[in-house]
C-alpha cells in the first residue's frame, strides 16, 4: 500500500493514512456505498466489528482464537455448528493455480485438512501467499500444520516445453521411475503423516492434477498396502 501511496510512515515509524482525498476519485455510486458503510459501521469499536462479523457470518469464527472471549454461549453454539470435523482418514491433492490465498485456505478448512504437505521442489511463488514462509504462516493461523517435502519435487528445468498432456505424461512417467523410487523414504514419511494426522493434502501449483506430479505422489500413496485412507482431489 505504501508503494501505491495509500499509507506512509510518520516520524514515529507508525503506519498512517495519507492525507489525499481519495473519495473524490471514486464515481458517485462507489462514494454512496462507502458512505453507507461508514454510516453503519464507522462508530463501532474493533470488538464490536468482530462480534458483528461473527454473529452474521459464524463460519469466519470457526478458527478464531478470540471468539470465546467476546461471544455468548448461544453464539458459540452457532459457531461450533459451522465447524467441519470428519472421522474418516483421507488423502487430498490441491493446486493453488487460479485461487486466492483466502479461497485456498477455505478449501482446506471446509475439508477438515489437518496437515498440508508441500511437494514443490522449491517452495517459492511469485503469487502472494504461496511461498513457503507465507503459506506456513497462513496455515498456522487456522491450526493447520504445514510441512515441505522437497525430495518429492521436480526440478523446474525439467518442466520446460510442456505443450501437451502427452508431454506431461512422459515427464511424470520418468518421475515415477526415478524420483519416486529414489526417494522412497520421503514417500514413506508422508504415509506416516497420513496415518498420524488422518487428513492430509498434497499441494503444488497446477490446477489440473493431471498436469502436476502430485497426482503421481498420490497414486503411489494409494497403492501402498494396509492403508485405511481414501482419496479426493480438490
Language-model features: locations:
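Residues lining hydrophobic/aromatic ligand-binding pockets adjacent to catalytic sites
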Residues: 1-234
